[in-house]
């Protein structure tokens, strides 16, 4: 049922993103869609893959929308019409999923085999979390720290690519 809910939210957000025109609103819609897609990925494939996908998307979106937002003035963020449209589309997808899946899911068919290790989100990839792979995690942390220091050095207050904000 949570998979149907996530799919409904994803389709609702993707249809809602066509109505929004301001960069802040588009950034919010894109972040919510990324959260939905990474949640779906972690439910279907592996939880660590969804988490990694979320981090990559968020990192790219933060840099891109910082440039866009610094150049465009802030306008009206979201209107009530957009929220009404979102809830209408969301409930439409939820009802459609409910009526389509009602015949496929029955209470008698549920068994305890769903709680086996093979059906969990990690699926058999628990070997990634072993002590032997600790060096890979340390190397990844050092690389991410180096990238963080590089980005901070590039975007220093007076030397960065962003425009300088002068407060009065």
UniProtKB/Swiss-Prot annotation:
Keywords, sorted A to Z: Electron transport, Membrane, Mitochondrion, NAD, Respiratory chain, Translocase, Transmembrane, Transmembrane helix, Transport, Ubiquinone
Enzyme Commission designation: 7.1.1.2
Membrane topology, as annotated: Multi-pass membrane protein
Gene Ontology cellular component annotations, sorted alphabetically: mitochondrial membrane
Principal EC category: translocase
Top-level taxon of origin: Eukaryota
GO MF entries: NADH dehydrogenase (ubiquinone) activity
Catalytic activity: a ubiquinone + NADH + 5 H(+)(in) = a ubiquinol + NAD(+) + 4 H(+)(out)
Main localization category: mitochondrion
Keyword hit for Transcription regulation: no
Localization per record: Mitochondrion membrane
Membrane-traversing stretches: 26-46, 52-72, 82-102, 111-131, 134-154
Similarity annotation: Belongs to the complex I subunit 6 family.
Role: Core subunit of the mitochondrial membrane respiratory chain NADH dehydrogenase (Complex I) that is believed to belong to the minimal assembly required for catalysis. Complex I functions in the transfer of electrons from NADH to the respiratory chain. The immediate electron acceptor for the enzyme is believed to be ubiquinone.
Name recorded for this polypeptide: NADH-ubiquinone oxidoreductase chain 6
Protein's organism: Heterololigo bleekeri
């Amino acid at each position: 049922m949570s998979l149907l809910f996530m799919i409904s939210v994803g389709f609702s957000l993707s249809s809602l993103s066509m109505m929004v025109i301001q960069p802040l609103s588009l950034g919010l819609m894109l972040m919510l869609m990324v959260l939905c897609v990474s949640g779906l990925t972690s439910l279907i494939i592996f939880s660590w893959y969804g988490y990694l996908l979320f981090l990559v998307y968020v990192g790219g979106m933060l840099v891109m929308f910082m440039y866009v937002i610094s150049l465009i003035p802030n306008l009206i963020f979201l209107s009530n019409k957009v929220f009404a449209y979102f809830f209408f589309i969301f409930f439409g997808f939820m009802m459609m999923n409910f009526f389509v899946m009602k015949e496929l899911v029955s209470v008698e068919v549920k068994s305890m085999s769903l709680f086996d290790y093979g059906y969990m989100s990690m699926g058999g990839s628990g070997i990634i979390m072993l002590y032997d792979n600790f060096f890979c995690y340390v190397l990844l942390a050092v690389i991410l720290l180096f990238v963080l220091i590089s980005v901070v050095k590039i975007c220093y207050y007076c030397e960065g690519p962003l425009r300088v904000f002068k407060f009065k």
